[in-house]
Amino acid sequence: MDTRTSMRIGQPLAAMAQVDADDPDAFNHCFADVNGIRMHYIDEGQGQGPLVILLHGFPYLWYMWRRQIVALTKAGYRVVVPDQRGFGQSERPDAIEAYDMSQSVGDMVGLMAALGETSAVIIGHDLGAWVAQAAAMLRPDLFSGLVMLNTPVPPRGKVKPTVGLQAMAKGRVYHHLYFQQLTKPDRELAADPRKTLSSVFYSISGSAVGAERWRLFVEAGEPILNAFTEPKGAFPSWLSPRSLDYYVAEYTRTGFTGALNYYRCRDRNWEITAFLDGAKVSQPSLFIGGAADPSLEPVEIRSLYDQMDAYLPALRKKVLLPGVGHSAAEESPAQVNELLLEFLEQLMSGDPTSEPAAG
């Protein structure tokens, strides 16, 4: 039974290239019953070319991909962009284990079925890259290519993620560990969503300098928001007031608990995936990051980028965009769009060309 519903609020598809991408109502908003939850997603370019699925990270929403939706649809692709479970207008289950990787990948498999599609290129940013990589690894029959933005997701390690992160933190608290606490980070982030989001978006971007930049580690007992700084004056032009307002309105409505539950499943994901020891992603892949992304500063994280081709043997290219931080798709949409379209064109044409994976 088709359980999808669709509502085009804004412009017809043919006019998408002319719309204000910052207007969330300019896109085709849909809902489907997927893997036991009600999922919200954007669906543009129905009935045209190959399917591309875009997965957001934290603290983002489908909306972070707004400029990619327009560019990819204009280029002839069907573009589907969900709010992942726990985010935005998608359902937010209460149980922490409802956010483990088996459920997240199950959501993508279920979404494909609801769409009536059998093949897609999957693209993920930040924690969306965790889901995208796992989906590509577990279901190569469905996902023909993989793109990760900003977060180099490692293969399954020999120890639980929490153990490795504690060693990296050297007595301090890495943000993943902070977010694993119950209720405390939820309350702190939700106390003033506008301050939270403006501080996070600015500090993790390439626009922040010096002491404004995101501190990945806080001291024991220090509030996580001390690691971020609000911009002085107007926000940089890559995030308009209208865009910030949309993020703030959604997180004010939903809170942060669903999103934080992904971090609370880090060890659980490791525990349930022993069968992935030594597994690699064999499909063609691409990595796009920011040279000014604070998240790449720890040597342990940077080494994942440097050694990426070891576990992505079909890596076509890895790129660090100069002056760009952790929000590459928003900070530098033209460059990101160009790289995505180049990769997709090669993939769809069957071009085996592979540049040296250097950035």
Locate each region found by the language model.
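Catalytic active-site module of serine/aspartate enzymes centered on a nucleophile-bearing elbow/loop
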Residues: 314-359
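Conserved HGGG/HGGXW glycine-rich cap/lid loop of the alpha/beta-hydrolase fold
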Residues: 38, 42-91, 125
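N-terminal targeting or regulatory segments adjacent to alpha/beta-hydrolase or S9 domains
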Residues: 1-18, 357-359
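Conserved beta-strand scaffold positions in the cores of enzyme catalytic domains, especially
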Residues: 29-31, 79-81, 317-320
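Flexible "cap/lid" subdomain of the alpha/beta-hydrolase fold that forms the substrate-access gate
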Residues: 9-27, 38-39, 44, 51, ...
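Short, hydrophobic alpha-helix immediately C-terminal to the catalytic nucleophile
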Residues: 66, 133-137, 337-341
